[in-house]
């Protein structure tokens, strides 16, 4: 695409919690070169928007309306495939909320609708977190040397029962295709592979409805192996409070450790491998220098991703999170579930058809829940980790 000077006309499908955030970012001017021209949901028009913002109750009508250049899809996961395909088939640009679908088969189907002129992105907003940008910079600089071990204990995604009760689709196979892996931890799995690459295999143990009245996984422990021999452990849960967020990336020349509040960088002189082969000290260790790295994480991650999406449409700016890269984290999440169901190690690349058959069996036995008639107190700032 060539450079476009006109503002990108954006429509938002969905009016739930995250959709409201995208709408605010657009109308409050946090995304330069973009204008909100339409919303879409089965409910009534949202309050407080300018009369120039059209409202539709059917996404197909919105797609055919001609009032948008790009569509943000922020709806329940089970609708992502149909809406996303409609957007791309209409030659509109797509920003999809995570995950891109219930399974990698759905993700691949969606990607097949993209054309060379499509700008298709996924809202993997944690790629804009200065913490992970700094970690990525350090890892790619080879300061850590060859990676040896990656551990991430991510159990501070606590969700109380009301979080599920007020939704008919959350934490159901039919509505979401999974639980903590595809909803909360999909961000962490994306960052894990973005920083350290894709594993070659995974053996996982998922527990279903351990802490909540749900049919999907709400607690996961997984063992990962990588091509160079590195290993990893990933733990995720929505049932622990206060929970832990500890991320360790260990190399033979140093390590990065995020303890939930601070990032530390340790550097070995010489590398562990070199010291191991050359030292005469029976109980010696390489000299290590550890520094605490100051990082200001107070940024609007969603606005940064949306700005990048708009810039890609207008000026061909490379996408921070192309839609295609959503297959990686979704593949890891799917493999962890399949490993649990089959009680065996799963190799990558994951067999999409095999996983889909298992998932479809779960979906066939699943149903959307009846929403509880309760009023939930919502503070979206408390949902981010």
Name the predicted role of every residue range.
Residues 74-75, 195, 235, 251:
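Short, well-ordered coil/turn residues at beta-beta hairpins
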Residues 53-59:
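Conserved SAM-binding strand-loop segment of SAM-dependent methyltransferases
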Residues 253-321, 346, 357-385:
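C-terminal glycine/acidic-rich active-site capping loop/insertion
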Residues 127-213, 343:
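Predominantly a Rossmann-like dinucleotide-binding segment in NAD(P)-dependent oxidoreductases
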Residues 70-77, 81-127, 142:
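Beta-strand-loop-alpha-helix segment that lines the small-molecule cofactor/substrate pocket
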Residues 217, 222-228, 249-251:
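Active-site beta-strand termini and strand-to-loop segments that position acidic
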Residues 186, 211, 235-243:
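Glycine-rich phosphate/pyrophosphate-binding beta-alpha loops
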Residues 1-50:
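N-terminal Rossmann-like dinucleotide-binding module
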């Amino acid at each position: 695409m060539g450079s476009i000077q006109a503002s990108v006309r954006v429509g938002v499908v969905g009016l739930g919690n995250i959709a409201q955030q995208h709408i605010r970012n657009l109308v409050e001017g946090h995304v330069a070169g973009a204008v909100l021209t339409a919303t879409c949901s089965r409910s009534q028009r949202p309050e407080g928007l300018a009369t120039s913002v059209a409202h539709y109750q059917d996404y197909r009508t919105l797609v055919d309306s001609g009032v948008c250049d790009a569509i943000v899809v922020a709806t329940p996961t089970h609708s992502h495939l149909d809406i996303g395909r409609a957007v791309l088939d209409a030659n509109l640009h797509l920003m999809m909320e995570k995950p891109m679908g219930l399974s990698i088969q759905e993700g691949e189907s969606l990607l097949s609708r993209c054309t060379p002129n499509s700008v298709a992105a996924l809202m993997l907003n944690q790629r804009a977190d200065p913490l992970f940008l700094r970690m990525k910079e350090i890892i790619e600089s080879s300061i850590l040397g060859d990676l040896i071990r990656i551990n991430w204990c991510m159990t501070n995604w606590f969700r109380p029962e009301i979080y599920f009760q007020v939704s008919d689709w959350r934490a159901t196979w039919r509505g979401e295709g999974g639980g903590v892996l595809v909803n909360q931890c999909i961000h962490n799995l994306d960052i894990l592979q973005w920083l350290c690459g894709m594993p070659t295999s995974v053996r996982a143990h998922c527990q279903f409805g351990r802490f909540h009245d749900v049919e999907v996984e709400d607690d996961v422990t997984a063992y990962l192996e990588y091509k160079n021999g590195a290993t990893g452990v990933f733990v995720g849960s929505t049932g622990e409070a206060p929970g832990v967020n500890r991320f360790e990336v260990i190399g033979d020349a140093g390590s990065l450790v995020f303890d939930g509040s601070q990032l530390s960088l340790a550097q070995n002189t010489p590398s562990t491998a070199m010291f191991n082969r050359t030292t005469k000290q029976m109980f010696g260790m390489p000299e290590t220098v550890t520094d605490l790295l100051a990082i200001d994480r107070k940024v609007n991650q969603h606005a940064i991703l949306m700005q990048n999406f708009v810039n890609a449409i207008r000026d061909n700016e490379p996408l921070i999170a192309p839609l295609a890269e959503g297959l990686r984290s979704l593949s890891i999440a799917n493999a962890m579930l399949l490993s649990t169901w089959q009680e065996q190690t799963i190799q990558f690349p994951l067999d999409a058809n095999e996983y889909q058959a298992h998932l479809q069996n779960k979906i066939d036995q699943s149903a959307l829940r009846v929403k509880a008639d309760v009023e939930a107190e919502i503070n979206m700032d408390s949902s981010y980790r």
